[in-house]
Amino acid sequence: MSGTLVLVRHGQSDWNLKNLFTGWKDPDLTELGIQEANTGGAALAEYGIKFDVAYTSVLVRAQHTLKLILDKVGQPDLLTIRDQALNERDYGDLSGLNKDDARAKWGEEQVHIWRRSYDVPPPGGESLRDTGARVWPYYLTEILPRVLRGEKVLVAAHGNSLRSLVMVLDKLSREGVLALNLATGVPMVYKLKADSTVASKEVLGDMSGAH
């Protein structure tokens, strides 16, 4: 009997609000982000799931989101594993820049390519493919074996690190994943088959509210 995998993107951060490229920089949640995480946690509590383990990145916005969710589901002391492999995509030289300022410096078309292409990284940073190249092996070696043993696993991470996972789980093409936006604080509940493919997927909230 295989288990359950729940993916949640962190709530809105200070830098999301300021329209800055964040990447591996480490801002905390806004008041709205706290509310989003609490809403996601309440949805999971209503769903009735109890987790065996949680995973998150080493960045505070994901860890704070996880803490709020675990409080809501009544598991504040759940075993939690933090790993850099789940960090957001590294935006390199764009990190900390306002997105409008970046467009003014490099041009709208170039910035769009860096943000939305699959395999073109910004200067000093990672492409979505690069991000997946560290996220997917970590999933295969650390997270998936637990799910296949029947455990219920929660992952609180970031837009691009989670898109890398969803791309494979949902069998999306490159074009499909580039069009994919994950709303902040909205849990995605995957039931996996014994062969690690997806038996079912349920979204506990509105995915149209992506930042």
Curated annotation (Swiss-Prot):
For this protein, the Enzyme Commission number is: 5.4.2.11
Pathway membership: Carbohydrate degradation; glycolysis; pyruvate from D-glyceraldehyde 3-phosphate: step 3/5
**Keywords, sorted A to Z:** Gluconeogenesis, Glycolysis, Isomerase
What residues make up the catalytic site? Answer: H10, E88
> Entry's InterPro entries?
His_Pase_superF_clade-1, His_PPase_superfam, PG/BPGM_mutase_AS, Phosphogly_mut1
- CDD domains assigned to the protein according to its UniProt record, in alphabetical order: HP_PGM_like (cd07067)
Q: Which residues form a coiled coil?
A: none
Q: Which GO terms describe its molecular function?
A: phosphoglycerate mutase activity
GO BP annotations listed: gluconeogenesis; glycolytic process
Q: Site annotated as Transition state stabilizer: where?
A: H158
Which of this chain's residues are annotated to bind substrate? Answer: 9-16, 22-23, 61, 88-91, 99, 115-116, 159-160
Q: Reaction catalysed by this chain?
A: (2R)-2-phosphoglycerate = (2R)-3-phosphoglycerate
Q: How does it assemble?
A: Homodimer.
What does the function comment of this entry state? Catalyzes the interconversion of 2-phosphoglycerate and 3-phosphoglycerate.
Q: Which family would the database say this protein is a member of? A: Belongs to the phosphoglycerate mutase family. BPG-dependent PGAM subfamily.
Q: What PANTHER family does this protein map onto?
A: PHOSPHOGLYCERATE MUTASE
Per its record, how is this protein called by name?
A: 2,3-bisphosphoglycerate-dependent phosphoglycerate mutase
Please tell me the species this chain comes from.
Answer: Rhizobium johnstonii (strain DSM 114642 / LMG 32736 / 3841)
